[in-house]
Amino acid sequence: SVSFPSVQREESNDKDLYDVHDILTKLYMHYLLNSDEGTVARKYLEKRNVFTESIKLFQIGYAPGKDLALNYLKSLGYELELLDKAGIVTKSESGIYRDTFRDRLIFPIHDALGRVIAFSGRTLNDRSPKYLNSKETPLFHKTKILYNFHRARQEIKQTGTVVLFEGYMDCIAAHAAGVSNGIATMGTSFTQEHLSVIGKNIKEIKLCFDGDAAGLKATSI
């Protein structure tokens, strides 16, 4: 059995969406690092040279193949309507709510202030799609978000240089190797909105995308 980390629920309704993302980030990471079910995910990360230090820094987690988020957040008093609005649960055709992320490695997505606003889940088997992102919510607009920007923004501002990766894992590995101005798109498209997020005083953007058709399409924007 796994003992869950204690959390304090804030009373402000305005913060509920942020709260549930913050709570789940801690829960998913705790599950990755401490549960037997997280073993496969831990071994996958080890093969990609992502170890405990990076896991904690990037708050990587694991969502097991059960309704962990739904049951845990309901036990804290959060309503289904809020969880649906946050994209944490999904309503099935039969009308039953289930966890959106099941048996997936979890990458929290932060806004520019470092608040978790969404998740991206990577499958650890042959399930499709390979990556599953949170739906668009009042907090999360995919075309305006760059992975790791909240952490890299100071270095980007100081150097005027951005290293743009296609994937989260590449960005995480590069950070461990000393690249502190690396960010990643959530997929393969880099938009004008992304460019406006980075800022006006950028001297150079280094593209480190995959050399396949999807990656080449992204660099042509």
What is the role of each PLM region?
Residues 211-221:
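Phosphate/diphosphate-binding loops
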Residues 1-81, 85:
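Non-catalytic accessory segments of DNA primases and related replication-initiation nucleases
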Residues 59, 188-189, 212:
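Conserved beta-strand edge residues that scaffold enzyme active sites
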Residues 206-210:
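Short beta-alpha connecting loops at secondary-structure transitions
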Residues 9-24, 66-205, 218-219:
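Phosphate-handling DNA/RNA-contact segment within nucleic-acid enzymes
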